Amino acid sequence: VFGPKHTRNGAAVITGAGSGIGAAFAVELAARGNRVVCSDIDEAAAQRTVDVIAGRRGLAIATRCDVAQIDDVNTLAAQAQSWFDGPPTLVVNNAGVAVGGQNIGQIPLDDWHWTLGINLWGPIHGCHVFTPILREAGAPSGIINVASAASFGAAPKMAAYNVSKAATLSLSETLAAELSGTPIRVTVLCPTFVKTNIITSGRITAESTALADRLMRRTGLSPEKVVRMCLDTNDHGGLYCMPQLDARIGWAIKRFAPETYTRGVGIAARVGSAVTS
């Protein structure tokens, strides 16, 4: 059922499409011949993405959506189906925020709620609303959830972010199992560093922001490359997309030697703190 052109010439809905990975998804999907609904909590940012697409003769509309609010996601689905005159063929649950720099017990509970509201409840709401729509359509389609290598990385001082992405990974795996035997393919994207503004726009301490920025500049892939790899993975029915080698190595070690991996992460964090202090 699924060929290499699955992500082409369809109808795509993207959350967090105002910048970064979400904007890259929107532009790439439009280039592949899809009509694209670009949603973001910042509608002006989503419109800027639409303007880029329009400048390349693509078809897209912008709409505001706070993925932490189920009513907003229901409205997004209704708007998309009205514009498409039918169901979408691809849903990308991408909207996300970053929190980091403090240990468990120091992280403000408000930061926990904010992070989980967007990073976890966003994908939950997206899957809850759109999965029945795709099931009823019964046509080849896809759901992409944007997680992170943080979903299995267990890096210290990133607990809220790690937990939100680990849950998104589990959500995606469970959804893929439930949709086995249907024409709906699920892919979870787990990159390490991607060159976006998520670090500077999140709630991260100055020290951690500086470190993450250095790592991103040295090792980060462009969002465009990450998006192309992810869409190709979904084309071919792949569940996991880990664009970078370090993510794939970390994933393998975590699976086969989890306690050794976790101890190693702790040692590396202590050494890193000693070097930078």
Predicted feature residues:
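Conserved glycine-rich cofactor-binding loop
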Residues: 11, 18-19
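Conserved glycine-rich Rossmann-like NAD(P)H-binding loop of the short-chain dehydrogenase/reductase
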Residues: 34-48
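The beta1-alpha1 cofactor-binding region of Rossmann-like NAD(H)/NADP(H)-dependent oxidoreductases
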Residues: 43-44, 64-75, 109
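Substrate-binding pocket helix/loop in short-chain dehydrogenase/reductase
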Residues: 102-104, 108-114
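Active-site helix of classical SDR
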Residues: 127, 164
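Residue(s) in the substrate-gating loop at a strand-loop-helix junction
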Residues: 148
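SDR active-site lid
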Residues: 181-245
